[in-house]
Amino acid sequence: MIAPSFTPAELEAETERLFKALMHADCTPGRSWNYQACQGFAPLTLEINRLKKEKDAVILTHSYVEPEIIYGVGDFKGDSYFLSLKARESKAKMIVFAGVVFMAETAKILSPDATVVVPDRGSGCSLADSITGDGVRSLKKLYPDATVVCYINSTADVKAESDVCVTSGNVYDIVASLPARRILFVPDRLMAENVRAELKHRGVDKEIISSDGTCIVHDDFNVAAVADARARFPGLKVVAHPECTPEVAAAADFVGSTGAMMKYVKNTAAPYFLMLTECGLVGRLQVETPEKNFIGGCRLCPYMKLNSLEKVRDALLAPRPDQIVTLDENLRQRAARCIDRMFELAPKD
């Protein structure tokens, strides 16, 4: 592989662009986004952005990946729902999904004619890996009258066995709107518990049965840490994801999807924020709201952190077979019906 050459002026301009965007980021222990770091990023981001044009590619970046990917080469950044919409709308020949494998599968489900690649095939998900399509079929035999709702953090074969997909931003409204009383919710047990609590609060009568998966990032937070943070930082706002435990969600000032958390912080005046989510989101907030103060407490997703500029470049330049997402067409169509049902039922902004 021959590295492309860029002029000193091109490299300096790219370094300045990156440093201006990333100078406030401080979200991953042991990493820096100072000027020297941006000098190291610049040849890669220039090469990737050149390759995107040559390959007719679009790069989708989840908010949990590192800032140099999001702001250096990403075409769209956001949560699972937003990025699934962008995949559905894409006309590009290639989609590079800087996230985890189930997200790239979702992009392939929604954009079947595109070549969809994932930078690291090892980027799994504790939720998505907790149940298979066979597991869902077994549960359906136990609860034949249940409507099967799958969280978007699930594999393509699980989506193919489900009636409707949901995200953390639309789960409450979609489940509340379903005519069935009995809901089989996979794979997130803690989100199911939060849905149960929210629907009870709304006066909606549903029996929610769940599988036993949890997110290794969000199930790690606890109310004792929240109480300690409130004692140390008067006026603190606590922001949590619905993948947290119901106890943590109840102790928070705001609970919502990644995108909703971003909006809440941007629109809320407070001296401090505690973000009970993945540290990548804190990185985005540090970049986009440098005037806000974040006190730490976030957690790292080891799967999201497998993404790197080098791997994005390699996936664009000459993707290996393991980086290319392939799906059986019958399975893809069944999974697409599940996701399309979500788009039909999701509240319109």
Tell where the protein language model's regions lie, with residue ranges.
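Active-site loop-to-helix "anion-binding N-cap" substructures in soluble metabolic enzymes
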Residues: 2-276, 281-349
